[in-house]
């Protein structure tokens, strides 16, 4: 089994990098995990709707170029389905039982995900109706993936 977190933009702050590294280490016994960053598109502050769509399209092309045809794509979206930690564990476990073994979680840029990425998605996941910094979302996501594996194995952690 392989998990990839595919995110737009780079982690800059040391504390986010340290948190990600800690969960990568913790996930080691359970699964292979890769973090792939694609460059965010530089854009002015006050963009028109057309310019926002162009930025999302360019970032979307970069995202799609990193996804293999056989990958199960889980996009993080405000409009996605909200799950409990147990629900995420159940969703991943069910998909693994069906033979899916290459999961790609996609975190878009500050303007969201392009429609082509959303169409490629096999599952839309939401952590909240609120907006979070993308760097923080990476840490929350990798922690929840770790928690899901602990739950799937029946190990103590999630309570």
UniProtKB/Swiss-Prot annotation:
<dbReference type="InterPro" id="IPR029028">
    <property type="entry name" value="Alpha/beta_knot_MTases"/>
</dbReference>
<keyword id="KW-0808">Transferase</keyword>
<comment type="subunit">
    <text>Homodimer.</text>
</comment>
<protein>
    <recommendedName>
        <fullName>Ribosomal RNA large subunit methyltransferase H</fullName>
        <ecNumber>2.1.1.177</ecNumber>
    </recommendedName>
</protein>
<keyword id="KW-0963">Cytoplasm</keyword>
<keyword id="KW-0698">rRNA processing</keyword>
<comment type="similarity">
    <text>Belongs to the RNA methyltransferase RlmH family.</text>
</comment>
<dbReference type="GO" id="GO:0070038">
    <property type="term" value="F:rRNA (pseudouridine-N3-)-methyltransferase activity"/>
</dbReference>
<dbReference type="Pfam" id="PF02590">
    <property type="entry name" value="SPOUT_MTase"/>
</dbReference>
<feature type="binding site">
    <location>
        <position position="76"/>
    </location>
    <ligand>
        <name>S-adenosyl-L-methionine</name>
    </ligand>
</feature>
<dbReference type="GO" id="GO:0005737">
    <property type="term" value="C:cytoplasm"/>
</dbReference>
<dbReference type="InterPro" id="IPR003742">
    <property type="entry name" value="RlmH-like"/>
</dbReference>
<dbReference type="InterPro" id="IPR029026">
    <property type="entry name" value="tRNA_m1G_MTases_N"/>
</dbReference>
<feature type="binding site">
    <location>
        <position position="108"/>
    </location>
    <ligand>
        <name>S-adenosyl-L-methionine</name>
    </ligand>
</feature>
<keyword id="KW-0489">Methyltransferase</keyword>
<keyword id="KW-0949">S-adenosyl-L-methionine</keyword>
<feature type="binding site">
    <location>
        <begin position="127"/>
        <end position="132"/>
    </location>
    <ligand>
        <name>S-adenosyl-L-methionine</name>
    </ligand>
</feature>
<comment type="function">
    <text>Specifically methylates the pseudouridine at position 1915 (m3Psi1915) in 23S rRNA. Specific for fully assembled 70S ribosomes.</text>
</comment>
